[in-house]
Regions:
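Family-specific functional microsites
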Residues: 3-139
Length: 139
């Protein structure tokens, strides 16, 4: 075998080992539970090309990787028990996680409805999607 082929084989082995490590890490990390819902393959996500506005792209990345100020995340830093990380925005006694923020919090219902009205035409059976399917489509 040529040196080039050996280098390629070695590179493929290293890449596959890393992908296996990546899959194990995202599926066994509490911090990455939300990320696992929509990220299944080790490849560049299409939203990186679709969202041109840098601020919007950064905001979406922060939600996707749990680099945000929601209580589900900030509670980790100050050791608030998981079941006590309530939404300070609506004060409904509900854990403030990504699902609550994106889909349920009543304080965000108007912008959420405006957004849904804009995107509904892009999805078949939008109203029939489960919360997980909706998050997967939106994120």
């Amino acid at each position: 075998m040529t040196c080039q082929i050996l280098i390629q084989i070695r590179s493929d082995i290293i890449k596959q080992k890393y992908i296996t490590y990546w899959q194990h890490t995202i599926h066994h990390s509490k911090k990455l539970q939300f990320y696992c819902i929509f990220k299944h393959d080790y490849k560049i996500s299409s939203y990186l090309d679709l969202i041109r506005n840098l601020t919007n792209r950064k905001d979406l990345v922060k939600i996707r990787i749990s680099n945000h100020k929601l209580m589900i995340e900030t509670g980790r830093y100050n050791q608030t028990p998981h079941n006590d990380r309530f939404c300070p925005v609506c004060n409904a006694g509900i854990i403030e996680d990504e699902f609550h923020f994106l889909l349920h919090c009543p304080k965000y219902s108007v912008p959420r409805e405006n957004f849904y009205n804009q995107i509904q035409q892009n999805f078949v059976d939008f109203d029939q999607l489960s919360y997980t399917e909706l998050i997967t489509k939106l994120i």
